[in-house]
């Protein structure tokens, strides 16, 4: 029992509830015994004030703009690490040694192929199907192809499933893209790094030699790092909730992908890019700023503000730098969308309206420009998000399975429907 406690009083009933402290961050009130003591539940739509679990993986301080993975700042990981190193960190809790990194890279690399029957599985989808619809179906179907790693009580099978998904997700994502545009699938090339392999599978064709640009590969790798995990967001909570029932890991990740597909979650970078295109030029920005400030105008600035961050999203600063590097490498330094983005950012950081409402640029503000420059259509943006977030989902799922306090998720509700009433025969209604 915690030494600290909180007392909740309602009418003549009160409850003494333990207060739990994490290693950093705010304390939480443990309400597990609230109903037993008071016959009341709590009401928190959207879980804005509710901690659903303990976790050692990711920490966010939204007020200060801090994002830590296993204690390491995202800025340091993105600057000095690579994606598979971050994957190892999220899964195992520590940065790997040189030998551990080489072994982990090898194990991931040699799971990149998918079962050959998967290629025929794709033909069941329409050619114009959204790639995210294809991703949901294919990832969910992995349990039918790899049922030797679905026993969640076996730590070895859990780790094999984890490595398989990290390795195969780029292959499946590239296959979804190729199927969507009518080009033949490109098999993985295991002497390439993770990001380079993915870019090659997306953009190579059999009739031409494709050489991956190292600047673009590094940018892709950094995008993967920045999207690897973000604590208990909607899709991660979905993965945990599905996993709490004992569902196999492939089904849980498919559930996360489905949740991520929602425009309020994974589609924000596409919306931000569309907004920049709608504004078009710098001289039109004042008009749209006025619209954004008008509460009666439906227009909203996309790529600004965040559910958690009330300060500058630390990932946005890294993404801004990456965007400049990509556009410079491709000879698009004067890209009009970037000019609009830079001026919008300047205004948001100096205008009292945006400062007061804490509407700072977030990662989606720049990632859409970068992905467009890399050659991806907007329909692939959320697919890339899902690819990168897979390791975070897996790490969170594994942590949940190993948590002795975890039980099947069963939220309560505030019922506002009809009270008890008697059935009336249809002839008398």
Swiss-Prot record:
> Which residues carry out catalysis?
306, 364
Entry-linked Pfam families: Citrate_synt
* Record GO biological process: tricarboxylic acid cycle
What sort of enzyme, by top EC class, is this?
A: transferase
Q: Which residues cross the membrane?
A: none
Named in its record, the pathway it takes part in is: Carbohydrate metabolism; tricarboxylic acid cycle; isocitrate from oxaloacetate: step 1/2
What CDD domains does the annotation carry? EcCS_like
First and last residue of the signal peptide = none
| UniProt keywords, alphabetically | Transferase, Tricarboxylic acid cycle
Asked if the Swiss-Prot or TrEMBL record annotates the protein with the keyword Transferase, the reply is yes
Q: What's any one GO cellular component for it?
A: cytoplasm
**Reaction(s) catalysed by this chain's protein:** oxaloacetate + acetyl-CoA + H2O = citrate + CoA + H(+)
Highest taxon of the lineage: Bacteria
Q: Which GO terms describe its molecular function?
A: citrate (Si)-synthase activity
Protein EC: 2.3.3.16
> Which family does the UniProt entry place this protein in?
Belongs to the citrate synthase family.
PANTHER family (UniProt xref): CITRATE SYNTHASE (PTHR42871:SF1)
Q: Which NCBIfam families does this UniProt record tie to the protein?
A: cit_synth_I (TIGR01798), PRK05614.1 (NF004126)
| Name of the protein | Citrate synthase
- Which organism is this entry from? Rhizobium meliloti (strain 1021)
Recite the lineage of the species. Answer: Bacteria, Pseudomonadati, Pseudomonadota, Alphaproteobacteria, Hyphomicrobiales
Q: Which gene encodes it?
A: gltA
């Amino acid at each position: 029992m915690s030494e600290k406690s909180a007392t909740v009083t309602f009418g003549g009933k009160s409850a003494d509830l333990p207060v739990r402290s994490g290693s950093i961050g705010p304390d939480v009130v443990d309400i597990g015994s609230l109903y037993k003591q008071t016959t009341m539940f709590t009401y928190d739509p959207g879980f804005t004030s509710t901690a659903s679990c303990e976790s050692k993986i990711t920490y966010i301080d939204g007020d200060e703009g801090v994002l830590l993975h296993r204690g390491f700042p995202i800025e340091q990981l993105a600057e000095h690490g690579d994606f598979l190193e971050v994957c190892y960190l999220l899964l195992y809790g520590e940065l790997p040694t040189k030998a551990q990194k080489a072994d982990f890279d090898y194990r991931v690399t040699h799971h990149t192929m998918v079962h050959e029957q998967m290629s025929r599985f794709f033909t069941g989808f329409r050619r114009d199907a959204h790639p995210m619809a294809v991703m949901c179906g294919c990832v969910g179907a992995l349990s039918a192809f790899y049922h030797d790693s679905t026993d969640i009580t076996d730590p070895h099978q859990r780790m094999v499933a984890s490595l398989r998904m990290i390795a195969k997700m780029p292959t499946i994502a590239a296959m979804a893209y190729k199927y969507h545009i009518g080009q033949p699938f490109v098999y993985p090339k295991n002497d390439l790094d993770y990001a380079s392999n993915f870019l090659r599978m997306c953009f190579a064709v059999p009739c031409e030699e494709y050489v991956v640009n190292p600047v673009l590969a590094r940018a892709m790798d950094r995008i993967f790092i920045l999207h690897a995990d973000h604590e208990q967001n909607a899709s991660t909570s979905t993965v945990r909730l599905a996993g709490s029932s004992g569902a196999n890991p492939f089904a849980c990740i498919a559930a996360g992908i489905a949740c991520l597909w929602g425009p309020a979650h994974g589609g924000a970078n596409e919306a931000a890019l569309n907004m920049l295109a709608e504004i078009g030029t710098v001289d039109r920005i004042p008009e749209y700023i006025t619209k954004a400030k008008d509460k009666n105008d439906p227009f909203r600035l996309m790529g600004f503000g965040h559910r958690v961050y009330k300060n500058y999203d630390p990932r946005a600063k890294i993404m801004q730098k990456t965007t400049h590097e990509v556009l410079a490498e491709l000879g698009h330094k004067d890209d009009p969308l970037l000019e609009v983005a830079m001026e919008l950012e300047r205004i948001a950081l100096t205008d009292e309206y945006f400062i007061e409402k804490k509407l700072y640029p977030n990662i989606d503000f720049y990632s859409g420009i970068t992905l467009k420059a890399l050659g991806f259509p907007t329909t692939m943006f959320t697919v890339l998000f899902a690819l990168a977030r897979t390791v975070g989902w897996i790490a969170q799922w594994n942590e949940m399975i190993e948590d002795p306090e975890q039980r099947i998720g069963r939220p309560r509700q505030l019922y506002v429907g009809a009270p008890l009433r008697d059935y009336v025969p249809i002839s008398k209604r």
